[in-house]
Regions:
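Conserved catalytic-core segments centered on acid/base and nucleophilic motifs
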Residues: 10-14, 18-19, 105, 109
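Conserved beta-strand termini and adjacent loop/short-helix elements that scaffold enzyme active sites
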Residues: 4, 42, 119-121
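A conserved donor-nucleotide-binding helix/loop in the catalytic core
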Residues: 1-10, 104
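C-terminal catalytic/acceptor-binding lobe
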Residues: 90-168
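Conserved catalytic core of nucleotide-sugar-dependent glycosyltransferases
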Residues: 2, 11, 18-93
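Cofactor-binding active-site loop characterized by glycine-rich and histidine/acidic residues
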Residues: 4-6, 13, 142, 149
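Short, high-confidence coil segments that cap the C-terminus of an alpha-helix
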Residues: 7, 35-37, 114
Length: 168
């Protein structure tokens, strides 16, 4: 990302995910219809009002689910995000936490006032090579989500204190 040009589109991808042939075209079109003013994603979540545990206190729109209407979310799964570099520039080398990319990304975007939105799509538009891998970040999260819960509470607090951001 450090070497991306002005106005380029950046796609964050994961080698465990199967992307459809029209992925880049549809994500780019989604962004352009919104004047590149937001971050686009496939997998996203909205935090519940009272967060006790990150894993259980969010409503997830899983990347495999059919979604009829594009909508705003608090968190995007960064394995399925796209954005225009005029909207966002990042240097991940400065990030404090390892393996907490989704929450760190959401906090940065929220602090900068950049909306996060999921694209409408049919069921299984984006698939997986393998589900429930024992060595995945998600498996580790299931053992202990303490740090993620603290980060999610900070994100939720920001949204609570800035309700106008919820309308974007």
């Amino acid at each position: 990302m450090l070497f991306a040009g002005d106005g380029d589109y950046y796609f964050s991808l994961d080698d465990d995910i199967l992307y459809p042939r029209d992925y880049v075209e549809r994500m780019t079109d989604f962004l352009q219809r919104g004047n590149n003013a937001f971050i686009a994603g496939v997998h996203g979540a909205r935090l519940k009002t009272d967060i006790k545990h990150y894993l259980t206190d969010r409503d997830v729109a899983n990347r495999r689910m059919a979604i009829a209407t594009e909508s705003s979310v608090h968190i995007l799964g960064t394995c399925t995000t796209a954005f225009n570099t005029d909207t966002l520039r990042l240097d991940v080398r400065r990030w404090k936490h390892r393996n907490m990319v989704d929450l760190t990304f959401a906090l940065i975007c929220t602090e900068r006032g950049i909306p996060l939105k999921i694209i409408s799509r049919e069921e299984n538009w984006v698939g997986s090579q393998e589900e429930n891998q024992s060595d995945s970040i998600f498996s580790e999260l299931q053992k202990d989500d303490t740090v993620q819960t603290t980060m999610a509470k900070a994100l939720q607090q920001f949204h609570t204190n800035n309700p106008e951001r919820e309308q974007q």
